[in-house]
Regions:
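Phosphate/pyrophosphate-binding loop motifs in nucleotide- or prenyl diphosphate-using proteins
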Residues: 1-176
Length: 176
C-alpha cells in the first residue's frame, strides 16, 4: 500500500527537494505553501468561470506555479536537479495576457469593489493571495537571494489576475 505520510515531519521540520531539512515555519515553507494555496484557489477560479479563454490561462498559470513552487521548495542541491524554471517566456506570457484583457475590458473609471459576480470575486481572492506571495518573496530575497525571474513573475501575476477579474466583471451577463 502506498502511504502519503512519512512521519519525518512530526517534530516540526520538513524536507526540501535536495535532501536538507528546515523548520516548518521557515519563510521558504511559508512561500511555497502560499504557492500551493494559490494553485488551489486558481482551481476554484477555473471551476467558477465559463470563459474558455480564462480557463486556459488559469490552467497554464497553475502549471507555471508548480514550477515556481518547486524552485522555492529546493535547496542548493535540488536546484541543480530541476528540469524547468521560471524564465522570461513566462513573464512575457503574463504581460501579453494582461494587455489583452485590459484592452478588452476597457479603462478603469473607479476603484473595483470585488463581488460583481462569483467568478470575478474568486479571481480577486487569488489576486490577494498572489500579492501575499509577492510580499513573502520580497522578504525571503533579503535573507536567501532569489532569481529575479521569480520576483518579476509574482509581480506580474497579481496584475494578470486583476485583468482576468475585469474580464469577468465586464461580461454582458455579469451581475449588477
Amino acid at each position: 500500500m502506498y502511504r502519503i505520510y512519512t512521519r519525518t515531519g512530526d517534530k516540526g521540520t520538513t524536507a526540501l527537494y535536495g535532501g536538507s531539512r528546515i523548520e516548518k515555519d521557515h519563510i521558504r515553507v511559508e512561500a511555497y505553501g502560499t504557492v500551493d494555496e494559490l494553485i488551489s484557489q486558481l482551481g476554484v477560479c477555473y471551476a467558477t468561470t465559463r470563459d474558455a479563454g480564462l480557463r486556459e490561462s488559469l490552467h497554464h498559470i497553475q502549471q507555471t506555479l508548480f514550477v515556481l513552487g518547486a524552485e522555492l521548495a529546493s535547496d542548493a542541491r535540488g536546484l541543480t536537479r530541476l528540469r524547468q524554471t521560471i524564465g522570461e517566456e513566462e513573464i512575457t506570457a503574463l504581460e501579453r495576457l494582461i494587455d489583452r484583457n485590459m484592452a478588452e475590458s476597457g479603462p478603469l473609471k473607479q476603484f473595483v469593489i470585488p463581488g460583481k459576480n462569483l467568478a470575478s470575486a474568486q479571481l480577486h481572492v487569488a489576486r490577494t493571495q498572489s500579492r501575499r506571495l509577492e510580499r513573502l518573496l520580497t522578504a525571503m530575497d533579503r535573507a536567501h537571494p532569489l532569481r529575479d525571474a521569480l520576483k518579476r513573475y509574482s509581480n506580474r501575476l497579481s496584475d494578470a489576475l486583476f485583468s482576468m477579474a475585469r474580464i469577468e466583471e465586464t461580461r454582458p451577463d455579469a451581475c449588477a
